[in-house]
Amino acid sequence: MSDRLTLLRPDDWHIHLRDGAVLPHTVGDAARTFGRAIIMPNLVPPVRNAAEADAYRQRILAARPAGSRFEPLMVLYLTDNTSPEDVRAAKASGFVHAAKLYPAGATTNSDSGVTSIDKIFPALEAMAEVGMLLLVHGEVTRAEIDVFDREKAFIDEHLTRVVERFPTLKVVFEHITTRDAVQFVEAASANVGATITAHHLLYNRNHMLVGGIRPHFYCLPILKRNVHQEALLDAATSGNVKFFLGTDSAPHAKHAKEAACGCAGCYTAFAAIELYAEAFEQRNALDKLEAFASFHGPDFYGLPRNTDSITLVREEWTVPASLPLGENSVVPLRAGETLRWKLLEGQA
């Protein structure tokens, strides 16, 4: 069993950096490991066009640690009013790589999202024409649908129809959480891929609910049964090029998580690759981690792979109880617990 693991530098194909005073902390945590990251656009107000994406990009670049080459890959936030012209202008910018479908009300800051999939068909047609990827938060939001069933319902009611209607559109089914989603992606064309988070590989709903409610495991899409967790582990460690790394690292201040009505999101960027390594090692599949973390994502996006590398060492360390987040603090996943892998510093 090797005590060192060297990988081509990975990228994060789904991350929330937030905005304002927190950026030096969130960008710094992402940049220590990742060469690039797909930046979620669900700010308030959201990132709806190329000009807003450029302004946000400049704020991220200004927050990078000294000497960092971390590259933010920007994303448009689709609304009912997103036009084909918005899509074409964003594609022409060179720095907007995708557009994100949030069903209205599905997750944090999604109130401006899409109320009916049909309303964005003109935008999707333009995206297919210019080669812009569609990123999907795949959950329905109707109150009568159980929260644990919302991903499967989205596949049945919407996603199947979208990929059939727009066969040349590249689609990323983000942060998949169910066996149903794995099977859908496996059966779909080569234009459909999926990201998988570290927390959905490492945990299931028992970890969140048995013995007390653990708010720092609460995320959307919510953790599912262990049979779904096993399906995700199978997919991530299979070597299938359709599955790749996307942390969905989503910081919320401690007081917003530890509350009567707590926010959804797990903060993992501080030790993302270490968490993935632990999940892959559980499956004796560390030899598959590099492809999942460093090859499949850029290949799907049509971007070059990174050329530098990172090294992990087998060394136990304790995750801090909290980390700075602007004027507040964030409780990271596994706070106060031990991780078995550690990133060698000074590699950015």
From Swiss-Prot:
Q: Where N6-carboxylysine occurs, residue numbers?
A: 100
Q: Which organism is it from?
A: Ectopseudomonas mendocina (strain ymp) (Pseudomonas mendocina)
Tell me its EC number(s), please: 3.5.2.3
Broad class of enzyme this protein falls into? hydrolase
| Similarity remark | Belongs to the metallo-dependent hydrolases superfamily. DHOase family. Class II DHOase subfamily.
One GO biological-process annotation of the entry reads: 'de novo' UMP biosynthetic process
Identify this protein by name: Dihydroorotase
**What cellular component GO annotations does this protein have?**
cytosol
MF (Gene Ontology): dihydroorotase activity; zinc ion binding
Q: How does it assemble?
A: Homodimer.
Which pathway is recorded for this entry?
Pyrimidine metabolism; UMP biosynthesis via de novo pathway; (S)-dihydroorotate from bicarbonate: step 3/3
Q: Which InterPro entries match?
A: Amidohydro-rel, DHOdimr, Dihydroorotase_CS, Metal_Hydrolase
| Binding of Zn(2+) 2, residues | 100, 137, 175
